[in-house]
C-alpha cells in the first residue's frame, strides 16, 4: 500500500487515508463472503447505460468500499472536472487546448465554444463532407484515373489515426459494404505497406493519408511509397487526386503532395489522436460500412457521454470502473489490468484501449509539474477469448501477481454456428467464476482421489492444481456488437481513463514522453544512411548497433 500522496488537495488526502485504512481492514475479505452476506449483491452491483450492462459484483469491494471511493472522487473534484471538459475549458493546459472529442458526437444544438467560437458548425460541415464523399464512393461515382470505381481503401496513419478506425472496422464486419475492402498501414517497417500493396490494383485503390500536421514520419514515408507505387503501376500525376485524399489540418502540405484542397478533411487541435476516430479520421469506418452506421457509432458514444455527464457518481459506469481501478492500483497493489473481449471481431480492442489508457495516464508529474508520489497509469493488455485461455490465463489464475480483469461479451452473435456462441459464453462466464472462486487444496485432492488416483500421488499433485481465487473482474455485456453499442463501449473506456486522470491530478491529454524518441530517431537516421556520418554523439551501445546495421546492409567498416 502506498503512502498518502502529498500532491493531492487536503480533502482528497483525507479520503485517500480512509481508503488506506479500509484496505487494511478488509485485507482478508473474500469476494464470495460478500455474496453470502448480501443475497441481492448481483442486482445492487449491476448497472445499465447506453445499451451496455456492467456486472461489477465480482469485485473485491463492499458497500463501504464504494462509498469511500465515491467520496474520493467527490473530494478530487470529479464533477467539476467532468463539466470543465464538456464545456470546452482548456484542460489540456500544457498545450493550451480544449479537449472536445465529445463534441464530435454531440448531436444537440447546444453551442460548444472554443476561443469564443461555436465549433458545432465546423463539425456538421465535416460530417456533410464525409457524407458526400462516402456516398460517391458507394454509388460508384468516385472514379479512378482509368474510369473504374474504387474497391480498395488504404488508410495510412499511426497511433490514434490507425488503432481506433481499425478496431471499429473490424468490429463492424457484419455491416461491411460488399464492394469495399479497407486496409490499414501504420508501421514504418516497409513490409507493412509492401504486403498491403501486393494484391491491389492502382486503378481501383484509394489512399487516405491521416496526419494532423502532414509531417508524421511514419505516415509520410508510407504515403510517399504508396504514391510511388501508384505512379509506377500506371497511375498518372493528373489522376493522383482521384486516388489520394487526406485528413489533416495542414491543407497546404496536402496540396503539395498532390491532394486537392477539397479532398482534405479537417482535423482540429481540440481532438487528440487517440480520441479521433469520431472525427474525419473515422473516414475508413464510414467507407467500410456507411454514414448511417458511422452516425450510429457517434450516437452510442453520445449516449455514454450523457450518462457520464448526468448520472450520480455512485451510479455512473465510467466513474465506478475508474474508481475500482484506482482501488486495485493504488490501495491493493495491482500494477496491470487485462481486457478480455469474448468476440473475435474485438480482437484488437485491447490494443486501442492500451493506447488510450497508457498514453493518457502514463505520466510521472501532476498538472502543476510536480513529481507524483503514487502509482499512476497501469499496464493495459489483453486479447480475444477464448484464445487467451490457452496463453496468459494460466498467470491470471495461479500467478503470484494478480490482475483485475474486464470480460466483454455480446449476448448474441451475428454469425450463429451450431453451439459456438453458447460455448464462447460458457467460457467467458466460467473464467470470471474461476478467478473469483478458485479451488482449494482439499477440493483439488478430493477430485484426484475421485478420479482413482492413489493417495500418495494425489498428495503430490494437489498443490499444483490449487487456484487461489478472490481475483476480481467486471463483466460487460450487450445484446450484440453493433455501431451503437461499439460507440458506447469505446466511449466508456475513454471516460474511465479520464476519471482516473482526475484522481491522479494528471493532464491525460498530452503525450510529451513520446517526443524524445522521435528527436533521437531523427539524429540517428542520417548515420544509418551515410556511412561517413559520425556516431560520436551516441552512447557506446547505440553506436555499436549503428555499425552493426551498416555492416548488415553492406555499408559498414
From Swiss-Prot:
Q: Which UniProt keywords apply?
A: Cytoplasm, Gluconeogenesis, Glycolysis, Isomerase
| Gene Ontology CC entries for this record | cytosol
The pathway is: Carbohydrate biosynthesis; gluconeogenesis; Carbohydrate degradation; glycolysis; D-glyceraldehyde 3-phosphate and glycerone phosphate from D-glucose: step 2/4
Q: Name one Pfam family in it.
A: PGI
Q: Which GO terms describe its biological process?
A: gluconeogenesis; glucose 6-phosphate metabolic process; glycolytic process
What EC number(s) does the entry state? 5.3.1.9
Location(s) in or outside the cell = Cytoplasm
Looking up NCBIfam families in the UniProt record yields:
PRK00179.1
Q: Which protein, by its recorded name, is this?
A: Glucose-6-phosphate isomerase
Which species does this protein come from?
A: Hahella chejuensis (strain KCTC 2396)
Q: List the lineage, top down.
A: Bacteria, Pseudomonadati, Pseudomonadota, Gammaproteobacteria, Oceanospirillales
Could you tell me the gene encoding this protein?
A: pgi
